[in-house]
Amino acid sequence: PNFDGITLHVAELGSEILEHCKKLKVISRHGVGYDNLDTKYLKKNNITLLITATANAVSVAEHVMYMMLSLSKGITEYDNAVRSGNFKKNVNKIETYELLNKEILIAGFGRIGKNLIKRCLGFEMKVNVYDPFVDKKTIELMGGNKVENINTALKTADFLSIHMPLTSETKNLIDLKKLKTMKKNAVIINTARGGIINETDLDTALNNKIIFGAGLDVFEKEPINMDNPLIKNKRVLLSPHSSTFTQECTARMGIETVQNLIDFFENKIKKNMIIKL
């Protein structure tokens, strides 16, 4: 093939395909993740990788808020109660919480984390941020408190929202050992990448009421296997990696994907759109 650039959504692009693209200079990804690409091949062959760095932050941050509110307010249980005719019966036994004065730990303070903190502060939450790559002043100027040790911060967190890439360092970062240190009313939200939370350990923690609940938009294997125990766990709120599927975000991502390609060939691509391989 004689093309110079590719726009890529969810298709897998391995070296067995890329090696036929002799003129390829750039791949513009429709999204921010690139698990579906052979990045070693791209680096070896000096192929630039671009992402839609700014398009999805609001949509994902709102999705986190939706999951936090749904879990803490018992939305699923209340909805089921009304639909099953139990308008009053036992609904006062459903355990619910306010967000006011609750402590959230935002793990990863990139574009999404920075959009999330504004929404959490609007609910008058206390915000701790764990990100070794972001300085204390930046976090404090946005109203957060920088924490240096994630293990210590987990012990007091009412909510944990994960916004890290999946790497060898973050794989199974949240395991049973860490979950056992958290509060019994704690809720974990993951809209980043599956595999950062050990799913077997999370299921165990929820079944044994070690923590209160979890909201997952991403999974170690996608689509999630139907025999995954989390499917039947009523203490988990699930969505199919859909936190960016708002009408507005979809439009922004499409435009940004194409614009990045144009900007690259016109030598005016913004640095934050380029992934360092």
Q: How does the language model describe each region?
A:
Residues 9, 30-31, 46-58, 150, ...:
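Short beta->alpha connector loops at strand-helix junctions that form conserved
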Residues 1-5, 124, 137, 265, ...:
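N-terminal glycine-/charge-rich "phosphate-binding" loop or analogous flexible N-terminal tail
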Residues 49, 185-277:
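Rossmann-like dinucleotide-binding domain for NAD(H)/NADP(H)
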Residues 47, 53-103, 115-118:
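Phosphate-binding beta-alpha-beta segment of Rossmann-like dinucleotide-binding domains, i.e.
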Residues 12-18, 134-229:
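Rossmann-like adenosine-cofactor binding region
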Residues 1-50, 155, 175-177:
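An N-terminal-biased, well-structured beta-alpha scaffold segment characteristic
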Residues 24, 100-103, 176, 185:
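Phosphate-coordination loops involved in phosphoryl transfer and adenosine-cofactor binding
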Residues 109-110:
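Glycine-rich Rossmann-fold phosphate-binding loop(s) that bind the pyrophosphate
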